[in-house]
């Protein structure tokens, strides 16, 4: 049983997020109607340089089960363990307000990871991050561009309004890697953020350059939904000691279940 005091605190945090107005109405409209939006990110200048340096350091030292080298990407899933500069990403007010518009009830951070797309890699298959009718829906995803996202280096493509469709790419397409009519690339300069409905059809395009393309990615879900990463039991004491009450709420550190 969650105590009334804790429940009141959670509700208060959610109400404060709901009262925000930092995400422009046109961005809200595009997110709701098209399924994704590209906006300025949370950090710039020297702080962004600090974030980039921290990202590179993490990728250089990460090891163990939270460090994954896949066919086209290299990922670190316990990113929040390493540096406080990463906190600014998931605490970004426009991002939290976007969560309110899509999830529409108290929510939590489900995953937060570093993801490097290596050079010379093929396009990813179009996909949605949740099966249609999933009990964990809705899901709000975000991508912070550590490097610029361009046509040639694997920018993420989205199929506008596909978050409203009842089928998935695998139900309709014989080649989910092929270009899809009407797809739109989420391009931007370093520091730009993409926010998207997890139900939208999307996937990175081919990185035909020799250079890697770096990003920070994550997802928010309802507080009662399953989490992709168990922050409550996995976040180290040093990281716990630095975070704010809002961060504790978003990481669900005081919830009884994840």
Question: Which role fits each region the language model picked out?
Answer:
Residues 1-34, 40-128, 132-133, 245-249:
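Non-heme Fe(II)-dependent double-stranded beta-helix
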Residues 2-3, 165-258:
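Conserved double-stranded beta-helix
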Residues 35-36, 191:
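Catalytic palm active-site di-aspartate
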Residues 38-39, 142, 194-196:
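Short hydrophobic-aromatic micro-motifs
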Residues 41, 161, 220:
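Active-site donor-binding loop signature of nucleotide-sugar glycosyltransferases
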Residues 111-114, 142-144, 216-220:
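A structural signal for short, well-ordered beta-strand segments
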Residues 120-187, 225-234:
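Catalytic core of non-heme Fe(II) oxygenases with the double-stranded beta-helix
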């Amino acid at each position: 049983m969650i105590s009334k005091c804790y429940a009141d605190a959670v509700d208060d945090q959610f109400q404060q997020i709901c009262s925000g107005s930092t995400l422009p109405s046109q961005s809200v409209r595009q997110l709701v109607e098209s399924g994704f939006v590209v906006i300025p990110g949370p950090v710039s200048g020297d702080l962004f340089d600090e974030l980039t340096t921290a990202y590179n350091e993490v990728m250089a030292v990460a090891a163990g089960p939270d460090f994954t080298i896949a066919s086209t990407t290299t990922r670190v899933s316990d990113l929040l363990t390493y540096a406080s500069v990463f906190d600014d990403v998931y605490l970004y007010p426009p991002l939290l307000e976007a969560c309110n518009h899509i999830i529409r009830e108290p929510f939590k951070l489900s995953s937060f990871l570093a993801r490097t797309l290596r050079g010379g890699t093929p396009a990813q298959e179009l996909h949605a991050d949740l099966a249609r009718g999933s009990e964990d829906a809705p899901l709000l995803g975000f991508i912070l561009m550590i490097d610029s996202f361009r046509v040639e280096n694997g920018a993420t493509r989205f199929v506008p309004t596909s978050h409203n469709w009842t089928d998935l790419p695998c139900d309709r397409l014989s080649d989910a890697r092929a270009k899809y009519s009407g797809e739109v690339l989420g391009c931007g300069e370093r520091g730009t953020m993409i926010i998207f409905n997890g139900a939208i059809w999307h996937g990175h395009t081919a990185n035909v350059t020799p250079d890697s393309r770096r990003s920070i990615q994550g997802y928010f879900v309802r507080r009662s939904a399953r989490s992709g990463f168990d922050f409550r039991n996995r976040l180290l004491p040093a990281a716990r000691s630095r975070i704010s009450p809002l961060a504790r709420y978003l990481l669900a550190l005081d919830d009884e279940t994840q």
